Amino acid sequence: MKLKDFPDEERPRERLLNTGAESLSNHELLAILLRTGTKKESVLQLSSRLLQTFDGLRLLKEASAEELSSISGIGRAKAVQILAALELGRRIHSLACKDRYVIRFPEDAANFLMGDMRFLSQEHFVCVYLNTKNQVIHKRTVFIGSLNSSIVHPREVFKEALKRSAASFICVHNHPSGDPAPSREDIEVTQRLHESGQLLGIELLDHIIIGDQKFVSLKEKGYL
């Protein structure tokens, strides 16, 4: 059954106009992006199959152009449309979260980066630099890869802090396993940066470890 054969009230575009985007399911929103189906499938069937292939939005968010276009019915043009929409969503999320964002509690720091970091396949060590009002003034990825105290050097962390005239900073890194429990290396890095910050007068407020929809604050755990 082609989309044009559906009643108006069941077509995704008409439903969006009549009831709002928030009322549409994920596969209906994706169908609007795809626009057309195949000879054998309506666009709604194609979008449903695409989501099933990637186990929903979680893995679709990480898909490459090659992975998308390898799926029957999804050529390069449709793959590019999907990737562009995903990137716009990330950028909008980034603007909403980072516009004079204030960090006062561990939850604030976790929420600031959870959307960006929870699905990363490698560990990313990020420093968030704050002014005297605890407003975010800059964010920098210092290191990508397995964390240890010899690789995360204080020089790289504090060079950016001094450049930005930061009053304090927060470290955030992810555990791709989804389990945010701190390792011995996590604790060692935290203590080393804390000691360096005391010497320079730039306080390490916390070290947040991001898991899958959960986090651990090393300050709350007593390591700072």
UniProtKB/Swiss-Prot annotation:
It holds the Pfam family UPF0758_N. Keywords: Hydrolase, Metal-binding, Metalloprotease, Protease, Zinc. A motif (JAMM motif) lies at residues 173-186. One of its GO terms (molecular function) is metallopeptidase activity. Belongs to the UPF0758 family. PANTHER family: DNA REPAIR PROTEIN RADC (PTHR30471), UPF0758 PROTEIN YEES-RELATED (PTHR30471:SF3). This is UPF0758 protein BLi02933/BL00636. GO terms for biological process: proteolysis. Coiled coil: none annotated. It comes from Bacillus licheniformis (strain ATCC 14580 / DSM 13 / JCM 2505 / CCUG 7422 / NBRC 12200 / NCIMB 9375 / NCTC 10341 / NRRL NRS-1264 / Gibson 46). InterPro entries: MPN, RadC_JAB, RuvA_2-like, UPF0758, UPF0758_CS, UPF0758_N. Zn(2+) binds at residues 173, 175, 186. Signal peptide: none annotated. Residues 102-224 form the MPN domain.
